[in-house]
Regions:
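Glycine-rich beta-alpha junction loops
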Residues: 28, 48-54, 79, 106-108, ...
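NAD(P)-dependent Rossmann-like dehydrogenase/reductase catalytic/cofactor-binding core
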Residues: 144, 148-235
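Short, solvent-exposed polar/charged micro-motifs at secondary-structure junctions
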Residues: 54-58, 110-115, 173-175, 235
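Internal alpha-helical scaffold of NAD(P)-dependent oxidoreductase catalytic cores
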Residues: 14, 38-43, 60-161
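Rossmann-like NAD(P)(H) cofactor-binding subdomain of soluble oxidoreductases
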Residues: 1-61
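Short, surface-exposed connector motifs at secondary-structure boundaries
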Residues: 13-20, 71, 215-218
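Soluble or luminal CAZymes and related metallo-dependent hydrolases
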Residues: 3-4, 26-27, 81, 85, ...
């Protein structure tokens, strides 16, 4: 996850050679800046495991692949080019039935997804599980409010959330958004993915909240809901 970038980037800078590096993880603005300090754009590109996830308990490692229509694997170059290397990795994902989509604005997808994931994670952690989250209208409403705060921060930073079609859900009136969210997030595979991520990466969740809150306050965005949920979970 993005907690390890500071450790791995100096190593990659010295040893990557002519390798093409695929960063396949959550990304916020400071992560993009850190990568640029160590690598040139010709050395790397981006993706995200949007339709796969999992976790483990004492006796089992489990994985999940979402079969939802909107699930896919985003890929893209930092500069938006549809390059040969992106096409090659897209072909590999296609062979694995992971539905790759090449974006010409992958940074916008990643940054706004970070905000969405933070808001969803806040709700899931408050509800104690993905299944509880998907069935609780009040927590879903609060999570959507948190997502809206995060997406407003993205907008202030120059990443237009409405450029990503999927973000439209979070701008709908609650009486429309909440029933849709219940149907989407009640998917069994998604619940497993949610639980795996939130239960096994609390430090990453905390960093996500802090990143958005810090940049929100810096740019005059009110992030009351995110702050309130973060304090309730981690204090």
């Amino acid at each position: 996850n993005n907690l390890h970038l500071k450790e791995i980037l100096p190593v990659l800078s010295k040893s990557a050679g002519n390798a093409h590096i695929l960063f396949f993880q959550n990304m916020w603005i400071d992560d993009l800046d850190s990568i640029n300090k160590y690598l040139s754009e010709k050395q790397y590109f981006f993706g995200f495991p949007f339709m796969v996830g999992g976790g483990r308990d004492a006796g089992c490692i489990y994985s999940a692949i979402s079969g939802l229509k909107q699930s896919h694997t985003p890929l893209g170059e930092p500069n938006g080019e549809i390059s040969e290397r992106v096409r090659k990795i897209a072909d590999a994902f296609e062979d694995a039935n992971l539905k790759p989509i090449i974006y010409n604005q992958i940074k916008i997808w990643l940054i706004t997804h970070y905000a969405v994931a933070a808001g969803l994670s806040a709700g899931i952690m408050k509800a104690k599980s993905g299944r509880n989250f998907a069935s609780n209208s009040d927590i879903l409403k609060e999570a959507i409010k948190a997502i809206r705060e995060g997406l407003e921060v993205c907008q202030k930073l120059g990443y237009n959330p409405k450029a990503v079609k999927a973000n439209g859900l979070y701008f709908l009136p609650f009486f429309i958004a909440i029933p849709i969210a219940k149907k989407v997030y009640g998917n069994e595979a998604l619940c497993l993915m949610f639980d795996g991520h939130t239960q096994h990466s609390p430090d990453e969740m905390k960093k996500m909240f802090e990143d958005i809150i810090t940049d929100g306050e810096k740019h005059g965005v009110k992030v009351y809901i995110l702050k309130q949920i973060k304090e309730g979970i981690f204090n």
